[in-house]
Amino acid sequence: RKITIYGLDVSGQNVEKAGQTIRKAFQDKKVVFREDGSQVYQTTVGELGYSLDEGTLQSALTALKQQRDQTRTFLASWKNYEIEYQVNKDEIAEQAALTEDHFGEKERTEAQNAEIRYSKKNKKFVIVKQVAGTQIDEERLRNYVDKTLEAEFQDQLLTGEVKIDLNQQAYK
């Protein structure tokens, strides 16, 4: 009987082994940061300090096994299950993984507000346009990553890779 949990095949595994497989797949899930269309940093969910709560996962897997044992059929078909889980986060690991120096050699510019200046040369006032900066604000970046990963976990907890585009939500 083929069984997948959030798209991850755990067929033929006992509760403990399935739990290990799920936790490893979760922690090894790639997170790719892109800026201006190219990759600038790659890490994993685990390196960002995220993990699945072992107790919650074991309870959910045990309950699923009991449910499946009660409804055993001769010709069971493949089924994908979504079980209860809890994500834990290590703030210190996340801070260490999301420092500005991880994001390439690109020269970063400071944001500048629009302003009006008097040009002595032209003898008139000139509007200097606002310039969006590219300096990374680490706190804003962490909040942006947290929100992005939270949404990703709802859609694809264990499969695929997360792509995060650096933009104004992560800049100062």
Spans of features found by a protein language model:
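Surface-exposed, secretory/extracytoplasmic low-complexity segments enriched in Ser/Thr/Asn/Gly/Pro
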Residues: 1-172
